[in-house]
């Protein structure tokens, strides 16, 4: 059964493994630990029964949420889980009073861009040479919740 729960530093090992398995520029365990211990960190895990199969997280500062990581593990991709998960996280953020959510995404990552656009995000800027491992540009995308109804 699919479920979504908050995650924290106790989930460090599995978060790190999913990140390494899915990204060339994955974070180290130390980076994850620092991120998860930050007072503004809000991370959510997507679980299939007891197995974490994805996560989304970032910083909640005032009424803005900066998405730092979102991933669905490769064996579970292309099953609409990313869209369902991301939509749920956005609803949770709205209930917490978030007015704006921001994310940077590789310009080549069309699956992620599609999820973001279907979730109400729009591209507002391009960060040149944003990704250190290959110099790829990133789109800056934003969703403004301030005029949305619940």
Each language-model region and where it sits:
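Acetyl-CoA-dependent GNAT
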Residues: 9-75, 86-88, 92, 96, ...
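Conserved glycine-rich acetyl-CoA-binding loop
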Residues: 73-87, 94-96, 100, 106-114, ...
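Extreme N-terminal starter segment of soluble prokaryotic enzymes
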Residues: 2-4
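Conserved catalytic core of the tyrosine transesterase superfamily
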Residues: 41, 100-106, 135-143
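Conserved catalytic-core motifs of GNAT/GCN5-like acyltransferases
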Residues: 104, 117, 122-138
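Positions that flank functional sites
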Residues: 34, 108, 131
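Acyl-donor (CoA/ACP) binding surface of acyl/acetyltransferases
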Residues: 79, 83, 127-130, 137-139, ...
């Amino acid at each position: 059964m699919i479920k979504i729960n908050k995650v924290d530093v106790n989930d460090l090992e599995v978060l790190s493994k999913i990140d390494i398995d899915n990204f060339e520029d994955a974070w180290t365990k130390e980076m994850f630990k620092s991120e998860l211990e930050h007072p503004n960190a809000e991370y959510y895990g997507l679980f299939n029964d007891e197995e974490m199969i994805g996560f989304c997280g970032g910083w909640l500062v005032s009424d803005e949420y900066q998405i730092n990581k979102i991933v669905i593990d490769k064996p579970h991709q292309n099953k609409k889980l990313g869209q369902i998960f991301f939509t749920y996280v956005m609803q949770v953020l709205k209930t917490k009073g978030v007015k704006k959510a921001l994310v940077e995404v590789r310009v080549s990552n069309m699956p992620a861009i599609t999820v973001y656009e279907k979730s109400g995000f729009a591209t507002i800027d391009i960060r040149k040479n944003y990704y250190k491992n290959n110099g790829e540009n990133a789109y800056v995308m934003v969703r403004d919740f301030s005029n949305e109804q619940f």
